[in-house]
Amino acid sequence: MLILGKINPNFCKIQFILCRNILIKGYFMQKYDAKDLRILRALQRDSTTAVADLAAQIGLSVNACWRRVKRLQDESIDRQVAILQPEQFGFGLTAFVSVRTNEHNDKWLKTFSEGISKIDEVVEFYRLSGQYDYLLKILVKDVVDYDLVYKRIIKIAPLSDVSSSFAMERIKSTTALPI
């Protein structure tokens, strides 16, 4: 878990270039030093990097690096996964589905959340503020498969509006946090 505290930019007397590893959009990272952040950045790029290679990159002994990696894994790393290329597995269509409902009670949310969570093609699911209440990211083979998923979604719970947009091109996709 990141522990952030507000920092007064006038209070920091060190040049920004020296502070850049600990300043994130006006917040001071109290829990991680510059070496921790370098380790986390490297692991975000490739979580399979050997500790010896990581230690050489960061400028630490292998043992010191291993201890830091272990601590960071325990405190900050949610999970390590392989990120697959959807197109290589036949998922040629990415749909973003905006959902609006007139229901805003716990029972409806539980029903809708559980139902959506059972649909494997829904790879991301968010509750929103603004014009729509929920946003789904769906990966499917084509429009025919999307229509099948759409029909499953609208059967889960009462919805007042469902609007779909299809990605024409993926320009940027990353799981790395901007630390």
Language model regions located:
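A compositional/biophysical signature of low hydrophobicity enriched in polar/charged and small residues
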Residues: 1-179
